[in-house]
């Protein structure tokens, strides 16, 4: 079923806007204090769209009513330490092109992917490290490297500060993992191997259980906080990346491989509600407007999927 109750609007990245901001000399990252980027000063008749480079995840900042887009940047073998964070207005216009990453002063952000906002912080996974930044200032506030991790993909942060993160891994099932990181920074492998199958998106359900979607199949897995498999549901398509769980238990799943979005209401089968969204990645839910906001990886764009009037 195509585009049920949805309208998709794509805001493409403008490469010229990104490239216009010069990089500081190598080795300058710790020489000066961190400085956040500032909002664009635009006239009423001017609107700027884009500014993304491999936008992998978006989180909704309800306090400022902005979308926080995490950009992985260039590949590490091309430009190391190139990740940055953009702020986007709900109409799709750019608020701050590079809020975190306008320069590299006091900043390490190599290749960030998944993100979450919790307890006044923006948390991101960055290869084998979880980093967090002050949501008011953008300033780096901490980092937890995890020994043995290879490349984290997504994360979710519980109210008590516990971090759950996925490692998608390789074709080796032993590399398919969900990690648990305590507020003290102690990391353990919570789940490993099947039924994980290239795990990607992760979220918490209303009961505090951990929900994970796989790239390798269409399974939607719910685990208890101690890692016990509770339920297995099926999305409409495999190749899944983005995951949103609403307070009523409804799940939305995006397929990065097939460009679709599915909805799974509690106790019901999955239904496709949108398609035609290339590389639909780690999305967020805008509770004010009842919409999904979906980054599109190397398409350097963000898609908005309207879910219709709230009931």
Predicted regions and their residues:
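Beta-rich, blade/repeat-based domains predominating
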Residues: 52-64, 75, 103-122, 147-175, ...
